[in-house]
Amino acid sequence: MSKVKRVYVEKQAPYAVKAKELKEEFASFLGIKTVTGVRVLVRYDIENLSDDTYQKSLNTVFSEPPVDTLYEEEFPYGESDRIFSVEYLPGQFDQRADSAEQCVRFLNENETPVIKTAMTYVIEGTVTDEQFESIKSFCINPVDSRETGMVKPETLVTVFDEPADVKIFDGFKDMAEAELKELYESLNLAMTFKDFLHIQNYFKNEENRDPSM
């Protein structure tokens, strides 16, 4: 079972400015006039947060009850609605997630939450597959974002593989040229043999040791 909790937050109709703008832009810029409604939800995936602090944060950190509607895990939508979600590319700074983590720590300084966000778009009306792809391209900036799936991850915590044992090239600095050439060819390196010779000279004369990788 996933340790990750998921929350969707949607602006209530009077405050859903972005959703209204997108509907108009799909018609004016993309020429798609069959979209009858657009919904925009902020998706929060949350891990490493106690149940008590999680409950406190729902209507303080993740949503504002007067203007937002909050859904836990899933949200209602029509059978014919088209849905897609957009997340930041790995390495891109997620300002919304960072702010949420800081706000949670204000509620409880002992918490160390991991939060990841995405934007979920619901397209209501009748659109073809081609039109839907145009809508996705319009909403996704490939420089910093990408489409992401709807399946909740098992964890948000990144686990790095244990590094492989370091290999020492015994005898490298004192190898004869013929033996060195044989090693060079076996490694398929993106350098010339002349460069490889320079490396040997460096380890022999400067480092006085065999290299590792």
Language-model segments: which ranges?
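Core nucleic-acid recognition elements
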Residues: 1-213
